[in-house]
Amino acid sequence: QAMAGTGYSFVSCSHKSLAEGVVKPDTYPIIDLILGKQRQPVITPVLQDTLRSYLAQGGNLLVSGTNLFSDSWGNAQDRTFVEEVLKGKLASRNASKEGIVNSCASPYGYINGRYTFRTRPNPICYSIESVDGVLPADKLAHTILRYPENNIGAGIVYEGKYRTCLLGFPFEALQTPSERNRLMESILRFFSIQQQNKIQYIQ
């Protein structure tokens, strides 16, 4: 909805279809990997290989979810993938209880504003009991969002031979369509994507 709301087209598929090669990611400028509240394995070894190959060709990857970092840290292969390929690392488990995210000083000033995500049961979206705190794992990676209650990082971006954006909370749990559209538009600007391009949207 956020991509459509900002005027971009997209194609939706399952993680399995992407990992098994049913969908060819190389024809799309972005993969938006929605992890939600998924637990281990967060990103399977097969999917890791697919994403590694995609990024090696200069791709753009957005990943959001509550457990990408915390559930990857107990497995050496998963942790290496997150640190060396996605360019992020775990700062803290259970990083926020208030459900508020603020932008912070970074080279990407257009990623700005305050965002809120759902922490209580509601009829619209699942509630978030815990989220990951994140840190950059590369000199070319930067923190773009923080949880104001403790200043722990909530989101990072990496810009090198490819680009990644990692959020320690589920993007879809943001409270309002306006918040989702605003943040998505900023992320797509970071990825330098034009509206005529297709977006690969992974659910």
PLM ranges: what are they?
Residues 1-30, 34, 72-73, 162, ...:
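Aromatic-Pro/Gly-enriched surface loop or interdomain linker
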Residues 37-123, 141, 149:
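A glycine-rich, often tryptophan-bearing local segment used as a flexible ligand/cofactor-contacting loop or short
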Residues 28, 32, 80-83, 98-99, ...:
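Residue-level marker of intrinsically disordered, low-complexity segments enriched
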Residues 15-22, 45-49, 149-153:
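Alpha-helical scaffolding within the catalytic cores
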Residues 14-16, 33-38, 64-67, 147, ...:
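Structural motif
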Residues 5, 56, 60-64, 106, ...:
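A glycine-centered loop/beta-turn motif at secondary-structure junctions
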